[in-house]
Amino acid sequence: MAAERVFISPAKYVQGKNVITKIANYLEGIGNKTVVIADEIVWKIAGHTIVNELKKGNIAAEEVVFSGEASRNEVERIANIARKAEAAIVIGVGGGKTLDTAKAVADELDAYIVIVPTAASTDAPTSALSVIYSDDGVFESYRFYKKNPDLVLVDTKIIANAPPRLLASGIADALATWVEARSVIKSGGKTMAGGIPTIAAEAIAEKCEQTLFKYGKLAYESVKAKVVTPALEAVVEANTLLSGLGFESGGLAAAHAIHNGFTALEGEIHHLTHGEKVAFGTLVQLALEEHSQQEIERYIELYLSLDLPVTLEDIKLKDASREDILKVAKAATAEGETIHNAFNVTADDVADAIFAADQYAKAYKEKHRK
């Protein structure tokens, strides 16, 4: 008996300039008590605007300052505040950890969840999972939910004013979507959605990649100028919606496993963003598979145009020994890691691919960057 095809997605996705000013319209009839979660910086950027708009729509808002860590203690602390406020709606505003915490709080309360990302830096906003850390920021577990967010609200004016590095990181995270989904589909592997990929997820993942190669560089320059352009709108949708649906229902493989493998090492690498590490992981996955030089160099060229890392030196591992890289490879091939969705490889194979990807990128840089 073949496995079931499963596709999951948020109930509603809204993207555009100044959409946070319409938040009350989207919540009409759902509830009149909310809890709004944002960190101190994001309160200034978007939090207060959201609360003011809710009040105009006769919706009460309990304001919570997020501590900075998506930990069980923080989830419990905010869930207690939300219970006392009798909140039927949880609104998370900000970056990945804030949004992951908001999802967990809504799950505790069985509440309606609204996600408002302030950067297009990862594909996490649309997903039905959170990454939970210890209070000290050490990865603990994935927490899966029975449903995706009820509403994802992406204000491109806010995204255009976020640091360009965050958009580039989101593009890197999203570029892994098709590379990974394609390999999971080919091998008949499982996805985060709990089944095999659908034709819909395959089409979305492929369109994600096409959009990023077409508009990625233009969107990056738009954010440098702090302006909203058609190219930025296209890339924000690719980074957030297309990549979010594509990774969850299309499948994760080696690129994200290698990203997770890097946690086995200490040092400067941890100052890199999620997407920056995934960029290198994607090159490693391409090196693990049979791809032409032209195909691999297409990715290297786009990464370099977005100031993304492509070599071990770029990800602060210039002096890493084979022993160090084997540690990464062993962690990337640990039981339950996503690499097994698409590959039957050993840690040794992965270590070889890491050194190969590094060499391919170094050679490309020498040839083209003089």
Curated annotation (Swiss-Prot):
Kindly indicate where the leader peptide sits in this chain. Answer: none
The entry's glycerol-binding residues are D123, D173, H256
**Which SUPFAM superfamilies does the entry link to?**
Dehydroquinate synthase-like
Q: How is the cofactor bound?
A: Binds 1 zinc ion per subunit.
Q: Which residues bind NAD(+)?
A: D39, G96, K97, T118, S121, S127, L129, Y133
Listed cofactors: Zn(2+)
Copy the pathway line from the protein's UniProt record.
Answer: Polyol metabolism; glycerol fermentation; glycerone phosphate from glycerol (oxidative route): step 1/2
What GO terms fall under cellular component here? Answer: cytosol
What molecular function terms (GO) are annotated for this protein?
glycerol dehydrogenase (NAD+) activity; metal ion binding
Biological process terms in GO annotation: anaerobic glycerol catabolic process
- Domain remarks: Consists of two domains that are separated by a deep cleft, in which the Zn(2+) ion is bound.
Q: What is this protein called?
A: Glycerol dehydrogenase
| Organism from which the protein derives | Geobacillus stearothermophilus
Annotated gene:
gldA
